């Protein structure tokens, strides 16, 4: 099946994947652009998993000041080489993550960064609220687990839905950029400032 060059170009622009990868994905999905994007995303995640163990000693400190100067973000985004750290695509990712932090106010990079006491307290509050509503203990436990998962999605940057596409998380976004740039990428830390907070 001959693949339309315009479709290949569109898919490349949407995913950042190479021409041959785009062409192959379109052929495998019968020319369906949405399915091809999904296929490349899945492959990108597979590529990202292979790179996950590699050290990230280079990177940038990115600053973002929201319009009006009332909200600011400092972000440390790491990669493997200074070549990628200077790349505009890497800087674009840093800006996207900083926008996310400014808008969604995460408190931690990942759930591993949350102190154990905070997790236990949130779980206990959710359990006690369910019991107060008259739920049996085993049901209250399930409700608490569900509320903890929701809590993680609110306070952990990597688990938050991406503000520009809520079908993917920030972790998914980073994996897409890992596939584009061919290096492991990691958010090390961030700080969000807001006037009056």
Swiss-Prot record:
It comes from the Bacteria. The keyword Iron-sulfur does not apply. SUPFAM superfamilies: Elongation factor Ts (EF-Ts), dimerisation domain, UBA-like. One of its GO terms (molecular function) is translation elongation factor activity. Pfam families: EF_TS. It is found in: Cytoplasm. Residues 81-84 are annotated as: Involved in Mg(2+) ion dislocation from EF-Tu. HAMAP family: EF_Ts (MF_00050). Belongs to the EF-Ts family. Associates with the EF-Tu.GDP complex and induces the exchange of GDP to GTP. It remains bound to the aminoacyl-tRNA.EF-Tu.GTP complex up to the GTP hydrolysis stage on the ribosome. PANTHER family: ELONGATION FACTOR TS, ELONGATION FACTOR TS, MITOCHONDRIAL. This is Elongation factor Ts.
């Amino acid at each position: 099946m001959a693949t339309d060059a315009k479709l290949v170009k569109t898919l490349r622009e949407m995913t950042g994947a190479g021409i041959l990868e785009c062409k192959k994905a379109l052929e495998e999905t019968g020319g369906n652009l949405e399915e091809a994007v999904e296929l490349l995303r899945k492959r990108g995640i597979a590529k990202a998993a292979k790179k996950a163990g590699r050290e990230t000693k280079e990177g940038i400190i990115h600053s973002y000041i929201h319009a009006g100067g009332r909200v600011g973000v400092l972000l440390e985004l790491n990669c493997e080489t200074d070549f990628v750290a200077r790349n505009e695509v890497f800087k674009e990712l840093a800006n996207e993550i900083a926008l996310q932090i400014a808008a969604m106010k995460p408190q931690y990079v990942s759930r591993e960064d949350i102190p154990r006491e905070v997790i236990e307290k949130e779980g206990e509050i959710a359990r006690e609220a369910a019991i107060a509503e008259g739920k049996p203990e085993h049901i209250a436990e399930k409700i608490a687990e569900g509320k903890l998962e929701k809590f993680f999605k609110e306070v952990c940057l990597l688990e938050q839905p991406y503000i520009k596409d809520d079908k993917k998380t920030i972790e998914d976004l980073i994996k897409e950029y890992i596939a584009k740039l061919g290096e492991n990428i990691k958010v090390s830390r961030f700080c969000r400032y807001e006037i009056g907070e």
